[in-house]
Every structure is written in C-alpha cells, then in structure tokens.
Amino acid sequence: MKLLVLDGNSLVNRAYFGIKLLTTKDGRYTNAIFGFQNILLNLLSAHHPDAVAIAWDEKAPTFRHTAYDGYKATRHGMPQELAEQMPVLKQLLTDLGFVQVSKPGWEADDILGTLAAANEAAGGTTLLATGDRDSLQLVDDANTVLLATNRETLPMDPAAIQEKYGVAPPQLIEVKSLMGDASDNIPGVPGIGEKTALALVQKFGSLQGVYEHLDDKAIKPKQREKLEANKELAELSHMLGTIRKDAPIETAPEHYCRTAGDPAAAAQLLAELEMHKLTARWGLDESPAAVAASAETLPEVQPDLLPLAPEGRYDLAQNKDGSWYAVQGDSVYLLDNDRLPSLLDAAGVQLRVFDAKPLYHIALEHGGVGAAIVFDGKLAAYLLNPSASDYQAGQLAAEYAAAPAFACAAAPDAGALSALLDVLSTKLDEQGGHDLLATMELPLARVLADMERIGFAVDAEGIRQFGDSLRAELNGILQNIYAEVGYEFNLNSPKQLGEALFDKLGLPPRKKTARGYSTDAETLESLRAYSPAVDDILKYRTYSKLLSTYVEGLLKALGPDGRIHSTFIQTEARTGRISSTEPNLQNIPIRTELGSRLRGYFVAAPGETLVDADYSQIELRILAHITGDEAMQQAFLSGADIHRATAAKIYHIPESDVTHELRTSAKAINFGIMYGKGAFSLGKDLGISVKEADTFLKTYLNTFPKVDGYMQNCIEHAKEKGYVETLFGRRRPLPELASSNFQVRSSGERMARNTPIQGTAADIIKLAMVHVWQRLRDEKLQARLLLQVHDELIVEAPEDEVEQVKRILKEEMEQVVSYSVPLTAEVGTGKTWLEAH
C-alpha cells in the first residue's frame, strides 16, 4: 500500500508564513487553511496514495522535554492568527474524510517514523511530506521524504541524500548529534559546525565511531578537546534528534484510508471561508439549490420562453456553460442569442444582473448600450468585500445565506439568484455604496466591454523584428558571461549561477537560502561593482523578460484583426484599480529605453491618431487636498514644480537654488510618504545613511505638519472602524491592523495611509473614463477609448477629430472632481503610443 503521511505542523507553518494574511469579509484569518489545502491537493494529484495520514503535534510536553529542559526552548509560540485557524482546518479535514493522528507526549516526527516503519514491515511504501529536514533520517528504499521548500517539493530518496550530504540517511542523526540544531535548541558539540560534523561522520560512520577514533590524525587537536569535553551533550543530542518508531498509535495502513466524511459540511465550511475555487477542486457542490435540495425537496421549475414583449424586472445570470437565463418571480427563462440583445435595451424593463460586462459586450455588438441594466450583483459583492479571491453567484448565495426558492436543473443557481441580489443590494445600501455602483462601477463595466471589443492595433512585424534583435543581444550577453566566468552553465539555474558567482569568481555572498546562494535581483544589484559578469546577468534577465513576457506574449495575443484585445478586470485590486490580463497591458515597461520601445509598436489604425492624456502627480494632489496642508496646496495652486518647491521648503533655500539631487530627494519623499516608507527604505532609495534619511523625514514632516497628522489619523480611524475609505466612499477592510504580528500590523498601517489616496486616484480615473466615453458618444465622434494605464487614458481618433478629442480629454479629466487643488492632465498625440505619451 502507498501511504502518504503529512507532517501537519510543519506544513501548516509553511503555508501560514508563505502566504500573506488572507481574511474573509468578516475578518476570519484563512491563509494557513488555504495554503495547507493546496499543498494537500497537489500531493494527492501528484502521487495518488492509497491512504493518507495527517500527523499533528500535541501541546503537551514530550519525553524529549523531560530529558532536556532546554528542548525547543528558544521557539516562539504559535502566532495568534495561525492558532485561530487550526481548529477550523482540522474540522475541515475531518469533513473531507481525512484521518488525523496525534499522541500526547509524542511529536508528529515520531508518528511519521512509526507509520513509515509499520508500512514498510507490511510491504508498503511511504511518502513523508514535510518541510522539516529532520525526517530525512527516515529515508530508505521504501520511504521517500517529499521535502517542501519555498519554491517546490523535492523528493528525497537515498541517492538524493547521498548526493547532497555525502552520507546515508540514517547518518544524518549522527551529524546532528555533533553539530546540534538551533531551531530545536539541540546543543550538539559547541564549536562543531555542519561542515566538520559531515566530514567526521563521512570518515568514522557514526557518533560512536568518532569517539572511538579521537586519537585519529584526521581530528584536529581543538576539535578533539571540544569532543572530549562535550561527550554527554553529544549523546543527549543523539537521543533528542532521533525520530522514534514506536509511538503508541494505530499503525495499520488501512486505518488511514480516506472516508466519505461529510461533503455537505465541508462545502458549507469552505463557503463560509470564501474558498470557492477549492470547493471545486475537492469535487464538492456548493450551489445553494443543490445544498438545499439535499436537505429538503424544493419545487422543480421548468424553464420557459421569454415573452415577446417583456416588461417589469428580471434578474439575469449566466450558467457555467455560458448560456444566460432570466428569473422573474418563480419563472425561469432561458435566453437565446435572438432574444437576449433586445432584452438588454428594452423599454419598460429593468435588469438586475450578475456580471454586467459580458452583457454589455452583447449589447454593444448589436448597436445597443445595455440601458436596461440597473444593478450588478458581482460588482456589489466586490464593493462589499474587495478582499475576496473570487465572485461567483452560487458561492456568494451560500456565503450570504440567500436561500433558494426553487430548483431548476437547467439553471442550478437560478433559485437563489433573486434572493442573492436582494441581500447584496440591501447590504450595499447599508454601507452607502449604491451611488458608487450606479455612477461609477456599473457604467465603467460598459466602458471596459467596449475597450475589450475595440482592442489596440499593433505593428506585428515591428515586434517580430524587435524580438529578433533581443535574441541576438541575449546570445551576445550570454557569451560574455561565459567568457567572464570561464565555462558554460545554465544561467536560469539559481544553484549553478550561485556556484559561478561565489565559488568560481569568488564574489562575497550576501545571503543564503535553503537551496544555496541567493541570486535574487537585490543581491545581484549589490554585487555590480565586483564583476562585469553581474551587470551582464542583470541585463540578460531584463532582456529575457522583455522577450518572453512581452514580445512573444503580445504576438500570441494578437487577434485576427491585427489588434490586441486585453481583458480588463474590475474586481481584483483591493484599492479599486483596474487590472488587465491576456495580455497585461498595464505592465508594459517604460523605465528603460528598450522597454519603452515596446510602446512604439502600439499604433493608430491607418488614418487615425492616438491621443494620450496623463494626470500629473494626481496622488500628490489628492494628498494636498485630503490633508489640507496649506504649504503643499499653495505649491500646486501656484503651478510650481512640486518636487522643487518641496526641496526649497525643506532646505529653506530659493527654488532657483534647488539642485537636481535635492529635487530627486524631495521627489522620493513626496511619493515615499504615501507608501509609509521609513528612514531605512528612504535611505536605500536615495543611497544615503539611515540617520540622514531620518533627519530628512523629520524635516519634511515639520515642513508639512498636516501630512503627518493625517497619516496618524488614518491609522487610528482604521483601527477603530476596521476599514479605510476613499473620498468616494469605497471601503477596504484592514484586518491586518488587529494582528499580533508586528510585520503584518505594520503592513496594515501602510495600507491605512496609502489606500485613501491611491484608491481615490483609482476612483477618479474610473469616473473620468465613464465621462470621456459618454462625451465621445454624445458628440457623435468616431473616436474610441482604447486603454487605461494607471493615470493615463488613450483614445484613437480620426485626424479631423484630434483637436476635439484633446479638448474633451482635458476637460473631462480635469473637471471630474472639484478639489482644493486643481487636477491637471497633460495631453499628447502621435501615430504610436510612444510618440503620444
């Protein structure tokens, strides 16, 4: 029998610390529950075990604590945010049918060892899933450790351990006896490190072998002294580190076969945890109609034909197969392609829908605008809880306890649709978010549908040639690197790259990971001065990213009409910003010459021109307005260069005396203050000491006192309310502020400071998009809104409409709100995006 045993505590800790804190809309922490399930599902998919045991530590002391008071004494307690998730996770695993095992006085490691030994004796094979290398001592031909690392799960068999450590798996405990283990506070022999311990065990075979050969010349005098003086500690460490195989638990592998569990309870719990995609991965059905039908018999409704002259209110949603249906009372209508378009603009009809954007696509394709759509449940759910990972009608109905009124086999979620839209509308009204939905988000869905439909023309041949030149450049860079290092290697392998830089070239290593030397961008940036190879490696990475993500990615996304049709997502960013995918046009790089060249391949159609309008320093203007700081407001009102004016005020010098370096410093702090940067981050950005940066920060806050007061008030109000708001009333819950973890809490404070500003900027650009799109239609222009990127709008216009479009963009963007400081938009034109910007 193939048995999979999970080291529960090890893996749940890895899940908790490896995933940022996730919460439900009511503030329940879920990241560890989410991550553990993903680990388990991936293991099941990859290995198809016959039985699964999940082993947990108990809170009670073990025999190791009895033997040594210091055992694990240096470990901190479990974070409260994780502790709250543990009982929920264990209940979920029980509902899913998994057998869990623990024993007071014994550790999960001992349970792994006991089950592996018993299954091997029965002729089976065992997979031990853990993030703890202690379990490697259990590896043999029948037992494989699946070692979870930050990036992947490594199967560790005897050959892999021999290759990595130069010893057999059972000898790893001999190594630990000598070197100790800081994480478990196992002492070992003071002064004997891993390298020495490995060498001793490789030569003498075991701890006992080392002590039997203390007179051997291979043992240096100082090592001999340490070994002789600490023999009892070494033997104690051997006992502490040895995994036992005789824990008093059920050892029959058949005992751990997965049971039926309680699927309905699991589905309900997952719905409460807002883990909808995981519900599907477990093969559970959480549609409200299905759940209710399992508990009671609902009246079955047969779909009907929509009346030829529909009137009144209908609720619309989409089945998983893409078909649409409408609900009116206890009637369900399946909508075919002929009747749906006319319904979307029918006079005398009001449509509450779930996910308006696809419907706006249909309306626009048929010459309409979707005028009958008055409410979107998906957008309402997003406004109520922007932190959710997904928004699906059936899942939200279960989450909001919207009970189905009937069952309909042809539309499983139809029975609860009206109840769901009712509760979402009520809750949005209670939150004061209806105006945000009606005037911004719902009209914006129409605008985004139109932008997706229109697309953005590109010069495909130019992109191909650019790709060819990048490949040639990459090949040249690669040859330079090989010449500098002295041999060829796989540049995409962190291990081989680390060996080339730190072993072959002798560069000073900055930090190490579990897999070896760190070769991340930050590390390489710090090593630029040591070797020209580092500069080439960074350049290689930049060019590779351009080629694979943008050049090849854009060509794959090219439509038959020669245009890129990106998908714009309204319900992803917690700040309210729009994102895009397939491809992501908002990440087209502009900070490098090569990256900005990509914008040159986004072109206007023949006979057309691109008109580009970009807000100038919108977030700083919002900061000046929202804080009421007179000095900052005056700088904007006078039309001054805000960064130059800031530098002049901080250093008490005339603006004419502000150097480029001083302006750069002022710019860094102007933007850094909104993102909660402290002296350390600011100093790093500016290349100055922490002390200098701290002085700079204090001077800045003394110069603009209301900015500091506002930032502090943001945090206090957010802690009191549990959320922050934009000036438009968009809310973002911040459960991070209640965390006992300092880093998590600090992150929440940064979000409390930044979200009102960044979120308000997002709201402004959204509202401007709605106004610009409508104005182009009202003035019956052929010009079309193509793209929004951060604070920038791009319109494609016929030559004879360019001046009119420039005026429309400037007026609508600058007049969309009236604040204490003016918004300004800079407008440019060109045949390419690069020229227009």
Question: For each of these PLM feature ranges, what is it?
Answer:
Residues Y360, H366, K378-A407, A411, ...:
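Function-dense linear segments that define catalytic or interfacial modules
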Residues E152-K176, S183, G322-L448, A472, ...:
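Active-site-proximal helix-loop-helix substrate-binding element of RNase H-like nuclease domains
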Residues M1-A129, R133-P155, A159, L233-L236, ...:
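Noncatalytic, basic helical substrate-engagement surface that gates or grips nucleic-acid strands
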Residues R453, H565-S566, Q570-A573, A648-L781, ...:
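Conserved catalytic core of nucleic-acid polymerases
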Residues D50-A53, F98, A121, D140-T144, ...:
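Non-catalytic nucleic-acid-binding/docking modules located in mid-to-C-terminal regions
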